[in-house]
Amino acid sequence: MFKKRLPTKRVVIAGCRNYNNYEYAKIYIDLCLSNIRKENNIVVVSGCASGADAIGERYAKENGFKVEKYPADWNVYGKSAGPIRNKQMAEICDYVICFWDGKSKGTKSMIYYAKEYNKTIKIKMI
């Protein structure tokens, strides 16, 4: 008959631009999403940066998830573009998965805004 319509959950996958261990990240993302993907449509939210953001986009593609892109507008906002983008992503998402080296200011900003908006956040130190 009719297929049950699943709710949508938006998941930011972000982190350091120099992080490129897809196989390791995939295992961690699978673990983080194991419960919510059963009863929800997943949308991966991407900041369109290299590294962890690109890993998130690849993961979405391989798993048949939609991707919503939030590129930073460096030409308009200059150095503020990254934090502005991170705030936007934190506002609209349900979950955040970050791959962080403990130093990246951009990832720290994403974590900050996720906490400000009381989002469920998983941080994998790399």
Q: Can you describe what each PLM-predicted range is?
A:
Residues 2-11, 18-126:
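Acidic/glycine-enriched connector segments
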